[in-house]
């Protein structure tokens, strides 16, 4: 069933999706990784926004983008070198939630809560404290 986001949400959705695609490019995410993180194929999301018709899953999509933005911002704060910041999600991580796997593996499970775990991990490590 399709429904439109509210005007405010719709105005936020397009720039949020653009920010997501820029981050995905910086992280060299594949189309499959982008879809897993976003919870839907990016091209479908773009088409829906262009048509002004969104489905009931859009609030979750915006929440996913919010977590990605937070993860990205935290990494930019932690690592002064852009390559280090962008590469962190692909490096094996001994932190408890990752079990030796890269953060990207957890981010790509398709579960909203796993994106939240990565964001909270960075916040909890004192790596980033949002203002």
Regions found by a protein language model. Give the residues of each.
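Non-transmembrane "mature" sequence context
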Residues: 1-131
């Amino acid at each position: 069933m399709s429904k439109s986001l509210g005007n405010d949400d719709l105005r936020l959705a397009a720039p949020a999706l653009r920010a997501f695609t820029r981050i995905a490019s910086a992280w060299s995410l594949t189309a499959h990784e982008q879809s897993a993180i976003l919870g839907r194929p990016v091209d479908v999301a773009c088409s829906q926004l262009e048509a002004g018709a969104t489905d009931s899953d859009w609030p979750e999509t915006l929440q996913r983008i919010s977590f990605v933005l937070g993860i990205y911002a935290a990494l930019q704060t932690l690592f002064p070198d852009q390559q280090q910041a962008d590469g962190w999600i692909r490096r094996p991580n001994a932190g408890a939630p990752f079990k030796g796997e890269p953060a990207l593996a957890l981010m790509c499970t398709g579960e909203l809560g796993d994106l939240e775990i990565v964001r909270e991990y960075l916040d909890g490590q004192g790596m980033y404290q949002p203002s």
